[in-house]
């Protein structure tokens, strides 16, 4: 009997050690992902997937990592594996839809049609599986408000979804309504809905800072301050509040020292991730801050830094043209 107990103890220890090792692989991949080291994340997660091929969360994080590197085919493959592992997981379907959508955005028109249809199908499935998967509802609504009927879109499909979402969460509902109007370039109504969203106790930092991105493009400093205040209450560790507050101060031409400090802090800590303003944007706004103070050399340095990080940064491109003429 003692030898049997010993064998069972060894077996239990082996299983526990294996589980710890597998969990460690996923967590190591997550840490690399959070640090924006997507190459390392992929390498770590691939090893974890080999050890535990039925772990859908590993495949999901692999898909997200591939998407950050704009590697659409492997992202789709990983997301498809996640769905195959757990077909009832709403989040897996949502991210498979996102992967299809990203590839559609970079595909030729013929391939894009098929991919767009797949995108909507996955978003719809995600919502059917979990009515309170708000991010899935938001992307489904955005798809229907922006995509043509040829691929399954149509605002008439979005309106019932917006109504259902508003009944569950007022902030999410107002955001969805505003985002739909943004797709239609009806900015007056979008403004109203986004204001209501921020007043309705939003719980999602992604929702809040998406409104921040809109406010930057519309040059709305007061809304940006509200975004920063609300975002910092919901997610104090999220660095995006610094960026949007800094931009607001530049637009208002107030407290230049504070604006510089906020934008510099953000540029040093911002993750390179979808949904976050790139560090290049912070340098471009620093350039504008210095340009308005007639500090031409400092402004030029910041705009050049922005272009080194992102050669397509329009704000920095236009500023350099101005400065060369002056």
Regions from the language model: what does each represent?
Residues 15-64, 68:
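N-terminal leader/linker segments that initiate helical-solenoid repeat arrays
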Residues 30, 64, 98, 105, ...:
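Residue-level recognition of tetratricopeptide repeat
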Residues 47-48, 81-82, 125-126, 164-165, ...:
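Canonical positions in the second alpha-helix
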């Amino acid at each position: 009997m003692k030898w049997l107990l010993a064998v069972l103890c060894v077996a239990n220890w082996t299983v526990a050690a294996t589980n710890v090792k597998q969990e460690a692989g996923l967590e190591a991949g997550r840490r690399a992902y959070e640090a924006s080291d997507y190459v390392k994340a992929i390498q770590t997660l691939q090893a974890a997937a080999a050890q535990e091929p039925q772990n859908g969360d590993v495949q999901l994080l692999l898909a997200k990592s591939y998407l950050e590197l704009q590697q659409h085919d492997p992202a789709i493959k990983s997301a498809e594996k996640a769905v195959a592992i757990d077909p009832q997981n709403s989040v897996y379907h949502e991210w498979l839809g996102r992967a299809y959508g990203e590839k559609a955005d970079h595909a030729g028109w013929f391939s894009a049609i098929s991919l767009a249809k797949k995108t909507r199908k996955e978003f719809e499935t995600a919502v059917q599986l979990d009515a309170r998967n708000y991010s899935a509802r938001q992307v489904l609504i955005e798809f229907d408000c922006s995509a043509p009927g040829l691929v399954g879109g149509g605002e008439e499909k979005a309106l019932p979804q917006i109504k259902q979402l508003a009944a569950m969460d007022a902030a999410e509902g107002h955001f969805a309504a505003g985002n739909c109007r943004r797709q239609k370039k009806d900015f007056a109504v979008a403004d109203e809905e986004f204001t209501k969203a921020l007043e309705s106790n939003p719980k999602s930092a992604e929702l809040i800072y998406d409104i921040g991105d809109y406010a930057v493009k519309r040059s709305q400093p007061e809304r940006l301050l509200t975004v920063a205040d609300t975002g910092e209450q919901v997610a104090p560790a999220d660095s995006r509040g610094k960026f949007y507050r800094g931009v607001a101060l530049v637009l208002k031409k107030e407290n230049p020292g504070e604006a510089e400090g906020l934008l510099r802090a953000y540029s040093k800590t911002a993750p390179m991730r979808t949904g976050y303003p790139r560090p290049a944007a912070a340098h471009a706004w620093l350039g504008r801050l210095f340009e308005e103070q007639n500090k031409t050399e400092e402004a030029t340095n910041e705009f050049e830094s922005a272009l080194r990080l992102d050669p397509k940064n329009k704000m920095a491109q236009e500023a350099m043209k101005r400065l060369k003429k002056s």
